Amino acid sequence: MGETMLPTRRLLVLGAAAALLTGCQTTPPLDPGTVIGTIRVDVSRLVELGVGPRAEVVRTRLEQELARAFAGMRQPGGATLTVAVRGLTMPTYVGGDIDDGATSDYLESLVTVTGRKGEVLATYPVLSMNGAGDSGFWFSPGIDERRVERLIVNHAAWIKKLTLG
């Protein structure tokens, strides 16, 4: 009986937490007429944390994904979208775990949109997550690269959703 109740309790707790967090996003989406001129991704914090060459991969690929995501609203001289990547977490994954969040990959950033005169138009904290096993078997060649790629694509999608609504 205890085992069958555990998922129900977990869902109840997660549901309550989600309900409490519903109103936490206080920054509204950008105005519909806002155009983006420049996209910058700062990974200096990842370098400080010792992420190594993966930091440059995050910078390059996130810039590419954001350019694709905002392609319809890019215009020279528009606002600047700056993404300061604050953390990349990829725990060791050896498969077989129940997805309880302990084997999840995370990418965290602070997105700031500034106007032509340098005024801050909006700021959005972004935390995206993927299951570590979502990218394939733990023993597959290139699994860590696929995990990073999935995080980047997911993160860019969340940035677009938060900034555009």
Could you say what each language-model-derived stretch is?
Residues 10, 62, 66, 85-89:
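Generic secondary-structure microfeatures
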Residues 67-71, 90, 156, 160, ...:
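Sec-exported extracytoplasmic/periplasmic mature domains
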Residues 52-61, 101, 142-150:
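Soluble non-cytosolic domains of exported or imported proteins
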